[in-house]
Amino acid sequence: LISGNGANVGYIHYYKGKFNAYQRTYVLDQWQQNIIFIQYFLEQFLKERIYGEKKEGNTPYIVLSTLSEMPLLLPCLEEQTKIANFLSAIDQKIEVVAQQIEQAKTWKKGLLQQMFI
């Protein structure tokens, strides 16, 4: 899914299953490529394209040609899968570390409160 308008124009989210797509939500569902690889590719390169081409009015938006005319440099499917799996594993590790940091902050806050009681 790609948000086509509003403050989050260009926001990309991978979703598997049923969902409601509203006006100006672009759904990428007919791919013969690794969709997770496509997501990482678009997250890397779509934002700068959007900000170069977005239309301004009361609400910023993009049009279909912003997406359909974007050149995609795609390696073979096997390589896409390897890259997507690698990047997904890194994202999972980042999430674990982020949770550990939040737990450490909570622990630190509790210790500081006990010190000054």
Please identify what each model-predicted range represents.
Residues L1, Y11-Y14, K18-A21, P60-Y61, ...:
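Residue-level preference for alpha-helix termini and adjacent loops
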Residues L1-N20, I35-Y40, E48-K54:
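Short, ligand-facing micro-motifs at secondary-structure edges
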Residues L28:
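Extended Lys/Arg-rich polyanion-binding regions
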Residues F37-Y40, E69, E79-K82:
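Short, solvent-exposed alpha-helical surface patches in well-structured domains
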Residues L73-I117:
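Amphipathic alpha-helical coiled-coil/heptad-repeat segments
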